[in-house]
Amino acid sequence: MTKNFINRLDQDLSNLKVSHLHREVRLYKDFEYNLASNDYFQLRFHPKVIAGAREACEKYGSGSGASPLLSGFLPCHKELLDEILNWKQKPFGMLFNSGFVANQAILKHLPGKKDFVLADRLIHHSLAQALLRCPAKFKRYSHLDMDELENLLQKNNDNFDTIFVVTESVFSMDGDYPNLKKLVALKNKYPF
């Protein structure tokens, strides 16, 4: 690495610290509940989950070894997908290895150039990142403001092929949630 490169990195790090944007990895050892994770109740430590993982590792190895499209879609993946589709009574679906990957894949590619996305202002950052990379135009509405959302739907209803509305079932930072009855009523009134 060149001296200029190292100096720039040092300056960038200093700027992050001054602006209180510097982050460090912290070691977390023991906790019964972790509401800052994707595993609130520590289910990954449940004996049945551990036994299932052990059995899968013995049968399939410690990973799929490839992406699903190449050779990484294993019988255990098909069984899981079939079970979910049966439970949800859906004809098809996809598996993703994380919520982040699902958000990126779906929102980056599903809305097209002639579509419009309306997103709650406080959607997860991974959703917002995906919307910045998708070909559709998007606009954010005020957090949980169903009246503003309805105004935007009414105003843009005939201007795009498809309108997508992006919100969350529970907003992870505050624990609040959208008025689902109102959202369903808007869905029935406007085709999105």
Question: What is each model feature region?
Answer:
Residues T2-S62, F192:
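N-terminal "arm"/small-domain region of PLP-dependent enzymes with the aminotransferase-like
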Residues L43, L70-F73, H125, M146-D147, ...:
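Short, small-residue-enriched loops and turns at beta-alpha junctions
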Residues A51, K59-G99:
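Conserved N-terminal alpha-helix of the aminotransferase class I/II PLP-enzyme fold
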Residues K113, R133-P135, Y190:
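Short, structured coil segments at secondary-structure junctions
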Residues K139, H143-F192:
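Active-site phosphate-binding strand-loop segment of PLP-dependent enzymes
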